[in-house]
Structure formats: C-alpha cells, structure tokens
Amino acid sequence: MENKLIELIETYNDFPRKGIEFKDVLGIIQEPKIFKELILKMSSSQIIRNAEAIISIDARGFIFGSAISLEASKPMIVARKPGKLPGELSKKKYSLEYGENSLSIQKKCLQKYNSYAIVDDLLATGGTVSCVSKLLESNGKEVLGLLVVVELMKLKGRFKLKFPVESSITF
C-alpha cells in the first residue's frame, strides 16, 4: 500500500512560502479503495484502540480523523485555528515551519474523555502536534500517540514529541 500512497501524494515546491516542500495528501481521498485501506490500517492501531477519543487537527487532519473515528467507533474532538470554534476554549500558540499560529479546543469536549490519539495528515517539525499535546496535558489529559499519513523525516518532528508516532509514509 505504501507505494500506492506515495504515487498519490503530490509535491509542491515553494508552497505556501519559498523554501517549503509541500506534500499534498488530497490525492488519497480521490481513490476510495486506497483511502479505505489506509483508514482500516490506521484504525487498527493500538494507539487508536487504547484511546478514549481521537483529536484531529485543522484542517486536513479532519479528513483522516473523522474516517478513523467512524471505523474505530471512537468520538472525535477537533483542534481548530483561531476564530473557528464557539464557546469556552482552551488555546495555545505554536510555531510552524513557516510562521506562527494558534489552536483551540472546546473545553466542554475535553471534560468527557481522558486519553487521546492525535490524528493529522502530516508531521513536519512537530510544532502543531506539540501544541495539541500541550493543550491536552494542560487540561489534565493523556496523549497516547500520534497517527499521521505522511512524516517528513528530515525535519525530525517525532523527536520533539514524548509519545509514539505512527506514520503510513515517510519522506
């Protein structure tokens, strides 16, 4: 399956900024059989099985997180960029490969579950995932691990994290 996935991922140089090599995973969801195979594989992870809930990161993480959530029969919580969630929020700033941003999670969602699997499309520097894990931990929650479709090994994001990382493809 790895070779099929690699074929479906397009690389865009200098996007969204000069010097960035953007890996576009959207080709995967255009191939339902491969997408389903990927979701079945990711859903069977011990990290997913042991978590009470899945937390997916804005925005491409939602695609994979929601499908995994359905397949694994686990609730999904979202971590969103500024101005996207109503209600009382838990917020945190983080650094990107190409700038700075922040993420928010609705506090009412965090009250329901104690252990989480983080799902995203891609792991680069680890800044976004680290932000989510710190948000969860600051609310007394446990991060069991991260599942991503793509991991950019040269950026060494996994080494900044204190929990297991499972990636379907590495570049």
From Swiss-Prot:
InterPro entries referenced in this protein's UniProt entry, alphabetically: Ade_phspho_trans, PRibTrfase_dom, PRTase-like, UPRTase/APRTase
GO molecular function: adenine binding; adenine phosphoribosyltransferase activity; AMP binding
Main location per the UniProt record: cytoplasm
Classification via Gene3D superfamilies: 3.40.50.2020
Keyword Cytoplasm: yes
Catalytic activity: AMP + diphosphate = 5-phospho-alpha-D-ribose 1-diphosphate + adenine
Pathway involvement of the protein, from the record: Purine metabolism; AMP biosynthesis via salvage pathway; AMP from adenine: step 1/1
E.C. number(s) listed in UniProt: 2.4.2.7
Cellular component GO terms, alphabetical: cytoplasm
UniProt subcellular location: Cytoplasm
Keywords: Cytoplasm, Glycosyltransferase, Purine salvage, Transferase
Any Gene Ontology biological process: purine ribonucleoside salvage
Function: Catalyzes a salvage reaction resulting in the formation of AMP, that is energically less costly than de novo synthesis.
UniProt record similarity statement: Belongs to the purine/pyrimidine phosphoribosyltransferase family.
Assembly description: Homodimer.
Protein name per its UniProtKB record: Adenine phosphoribosyltransferase
Source species of the chain: Prochlorococcus marinus (strain MIT 9515)
Lineage: Bacteria, Bacillati, Cyanobacteriota, Cyanophyceae, Synechococcales
